[in-house]
A protein has these predicted regions:
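Membrane-interface transmembrane helices that cradle and orient dolichyl/undecaprenyl
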Residues: 114, 153-173, 295-296, 342
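Extracytosolic helix-loop segments that constitute the early lumenal/periplasmic catalytic or substrate-binding loops
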Residues: 22-27, 41-65, 72-75, 79, ...
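Transmembrane-helix motifs of polytopic, lipid-linked glycan transferases
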Residues: 93-117, 154
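Transmembrane-lumen/periplasm boundary regions of multi-pass, lipid-linked membrane glycan transferases
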Residues: 41-47, 180, 189-299, 309-320
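Hydrophobic/aromatic-rich transmembrane helices and adjacent perimembrane loops
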Residues: 320-350
Length: 468
């Protein structure tokens, strides 16, 4: 019996990992493509699937002028479409995998820091059950964030390993991970580098790194694929680099772009978001992160690693333009900081086991219930039905019997977004249906129209006799 006892922790880890994976994949294909930015990514992927052009993302089969990020995510999505078909699962499956990899890497890193499997499991559990990890635009959907967060977590792993061992291979792995992050979402990885630099400075590893010739070779090797991609893209799509500058780099961050204008939000935007929704229950455990070094009476290296990363990253993104998904990379950082803080407190005094155990258990149950409910009951918000109504119609087999190539899509003049475009292209490929968009002034008698806005219906009633 004793020989089997050593496998109990392994079994518990597997069981808990299966549990926390459920909110990532359960009913992942029920909701249609989301407007920002999944539906655009899906069109990029289905067009690359058709053309085989692996260099340039396209929309309406013309080079992208809005979604300007390199195509690393698109490559994964095209591969997935070839496996699962032209559907939501084909677009979202890579994100689910990336999110699971994030949890595994986070577990591995915290375990290396503490050698305690339950502390490592706590970090992954906190991350997986935080709404800022799995909800819209994040771990369950075909946006860039799942891949980006995965790459960031891998970057933390290799940086920490370098700091602990000073092995050359981790320098090269760091350069590779940064290069992949750039090919995922441009220079957003740059917002992590100050925190990494500060930790290496704290850990007295900056000078050895700067003196190592492999640092510069790794930097060169990492830069080659990045510069090669942007150079080739500019050759194929002249003006691409100028668009990237305006829409992806500093003008976007400081909200001075000539192409995009963002709503001005307060500096506290992300802190409020984490408190109110993204870590709704776990936010109370962040108190432990503040208390841990004082109670432990030491500035622990592992605590500093996570706390420096999280604090500096949140301060940097709070200084620029804001979208709710920009804070996604902070969730694994905060989860790591909380888990390490619990570890420090327990090591300081065993009486904290019960003191911390009960509130952590309550937070775990509440957070998991929220995550499971989100996955189990996917539904449109009342204000999303007009935007996504056509998508629901086109993905329903019962409705497709009434659709022909003479059916046209008529959208609202002001809110005429096209999150359904992926479905239109999929129907053209799979069924030969060529559904075009039309305008109010082009409508002819006996046209069959797909509409989803009440304002459009009202305009039709004012000018035509209609049959629904």
């Amino acid at each position: 019996m004793k020989s089997y006892a050593k496998y109990i922790p392994h079994l518990l880890v597997v069981i808990v990992f299966f549990m926390i994976s459920i909110p990532l994949w359960l009913k992942v294909d029920v909701l249609p493509m989301r407007l920002w930015d999944e539906s655009r990514n899906a069109v990029n992927a289905i067009e690359m699937y058709q053309t085989g052009d692996w260099l340039v993302r396209t929309y309406d089969f013309a080079p992208e002028t809005y979604e300007l990020k390199p195509p690393l995510l698109t490559w994964f999505q095209v591969a997935s479409l070839n496996i699962f078909g032209l559907n939501e699962l084909g677009i979202r499956f890579p994100s689910v995998v990336f999110s699971l990899v994030t949890l595994i890497v986070l577990f591995s890193l915290v375990y290396r820091m503490t050698r305690k499997w339950y502390i490592a499991l706590l970090a992954s559990f906190i991350c997986a059950t935080s709404a800022g990890f799995y909800t819209a635009h994040l771990g369950r959907f075909g946006d860039h964030e799942a891949l980006l967060v995965c790459l960031y977590t891998c970057l933390f792993y290799v940086v920490y390993q370098y700091s602990s061992t000073e092995r050359v291979r981790y320098i090269y792995l760091t350069a590779l991970t940064v290069a992949l992050a750039v090919l995922c979402k441009s220079i957003s990885v740059g917002m992590l580098l100050p925190g990494i630099f500060l930790f290496l400075l704290f850990d007295k590893k900056i000078l050895p790194l700067l003196k190592n010739k492999h640092t510069y070779l790794a930097l060169l090797l990492g830069a080659v694929p990045v510069f090669a991609y942007y150079y080739l893209r500019e050759q194929v799509q002249p003006g691409y680099l100028e668009m990237v500058w305006q829409m992806e780099l500093f003008p976007r961050f400081f909200n001075t772009s000539t192409e995009l204008v963002f709503q001005e939000d307060p500096f506290s935007y992300y802190f409020n978001l984490i408190r109110n929704s993204q870590m709704e229950y776990w936010v109370w455990s962040l108190i432990l992160v503040i208390l841990a070094p004082f109670i432990a009476k030491k500035l622990d290296r592992q605590w500093a690693f996570w706390s420096i990363q999280a604090a500096l990253f949140l301060l940097i993104i709070s200084s620029g333009t804001k979208n709710f998904w920009y804070s996604a990379p902070a969730i694994p950082m905060l989860a790591g900081a909380i888990a390490i803080s619990v570890h420090l407190l327990i090591n300081k005094n065993r009486k904290y086991n019960l003191t911390l155990g009960l509130p952590l258990l309550v937070m775990s149950v509440l957070s998991y219930q929220k995550a499971y409910k989100y996955a189990m009951q996917p539904a449109e918000r009342y204000y999303e039905w007009e935007t996504n109504g056509i998508s629901h119609f086109l993905k329903n087999e019962n409705h497709l019997a009434n659709i022909t190539s003479n059916t046209k899509v008529l959208l609202d003049d002001q809110y005429g977004f096209e999150p359904h475009k992926f479905y239109i292209e999929a129907l053209k490929i799979e069924r030969g249906l060529d559904i075009k968009r039309t305008e109010l002034y082009n409508i002819k008698p006996y046209d069959t129209l797909l509409i989803s806005h009440l304002s459009t219906l009202q305009k039709l009633k004012e000018s035509y006799g209609i049959e629904v």
